[in-house]
Regions:
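Loop/turn residues immediately N-terminal
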Residues: 33-37, 69, 77-81, 123-126, ...
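Conserved beta-propeller blade signature
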Residues: 26-30, 70-73, 116-119, 168, ...
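Short loop/turn segments that connect beta-strands within beta-propeller blades
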Residues: 41-44, 84-88, 130-134, 188-191, ...
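N-terminal signal peptide c-region/cleavage motif recognized by signal peptidases
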Residues: 17-21
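Structural signature of eukaryotic scaffold interfaces centered on beta-propeller domains
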Residues: 60-68, 99-115, 151-169, 205-217, ...
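Blade-level signature of beta-propeller repeat domains, shared across WD40, Kelch, NHL, RCC1
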Residues: 239-260
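An edge-strand/N-cap motif at the start of beta-rich repeat modules
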Residues: 24-42
């Protein structure tokens, strides 16, 4: 069945949908009340929410670490935790060496080359974190490169690295600015420079985003927004909607991790 989606979805993503997307994935969604929900991108169905226990705080974001395959999260109390997404049991493995105040949404994503956790906030905070010790390196604040958007304050709400499988020879960090409806390449990541890649049209303030790499060197970018699942073209920012995810909880989704 072929279904078309329009602006009636509540946000103006450019979209034409297919019933069964190529490269189907299992996505792990994090709610704002610290629950995990598995999403099947092929069936567009959500599993039963699993409450996270033992995190010692509210989870700000999650990601799967390429180095060991485990799910990691960062809490609003500065804890770095590993999470069994089947049971919801979290274990504190480290504490951030410096306080992190995101000023809204947070980005939590692993750099697979360096095996370091990128932690960023809507207020421009840009941390590089050792996941085993919690040691923080404060990198350059988030800014747009000189040009049409130079001087504009980024409001980055989501971000993810490419090639997050094994220990790759290269990677790239993509971010989403919902105030401008913009997909960016953050390069260099440590300097926080946002390079515009394409307009994503009107987006809600909160979106969840991750990139799933495959063994052949491909990358598929997933977006969850207002209960709708889509695929993002990283070269242009265009979003192809796949449809509404059935069975999502009423709580806001703040992050997704695409599972290997």
């Amino acid at each position: 069945m072929h279904v078309s989606y329009s602006l009636a979805l509540g946000f103006g993503l450019a979209a034409a949908a297919a019933a069964t997307p190529a490269g189907a994935a299992t996505l792990l969604a994090l709610t704002n009340d610290s629950r995990l929900v598995e999403i099947d991108s092929e069936t567009l169905g959500a599993g039963r929410p699993v409450a996270i226990r033992g995190a010692e705080g509210r989870l700000l974001g999650i990601d799967q670490r390429a180095a060991d395959g485990r799910i990691y999260g960062v809490t609003d109390t500065g804890r770095i935790v590993t999470i069994d997404h089947r049971s919801g049991q979290a274990v504190v493995v480290a504490r951030l060496s410096e306080p992190f105040t995101p000023g809204g949404r947070s980005v939590v994503d692993f750099n697979p080359m360096a095996d370091r956790l990128r932690l960023m906030g809507m207020n421009g905070a840009n941390f590089r974190v050792h996941p085993d010790t919690g040691a923080v390196t404060r990198d350059g604040g988030l800014t747009y490169q000189p040009g049409p958007l130079g001087g504009t304050v980024p409001r980055i709400v989501a971000g993810a690295y490419t090639n997050s499988i094994g220990k790759p020879s290269s990677t790239a960090l993509y971010t989403i600015d919902t105030s401008l409806g913009q997909l960016n390449l953050q390069a260099p990541p440590n300097e926080g420079v946002q390079q515009a890649r394409g307009a994503m049209e009107s987006l809600p303030a909160g979106v969840a985003f991750d990139i799933l790499a495959d063994a052949q060197g491909g990358n598929r970018a997933w977006l969850l927004s207002a209960g709708q699942l889509g695929v993002v073209t990283l070269e242009t920012g265009q979003v192809r909607l796949l449809g509404a995810v059935a069975g999502l909880p009423g709580s806001e989704i703040v992050d997704i991790a695409a599972l290997h």
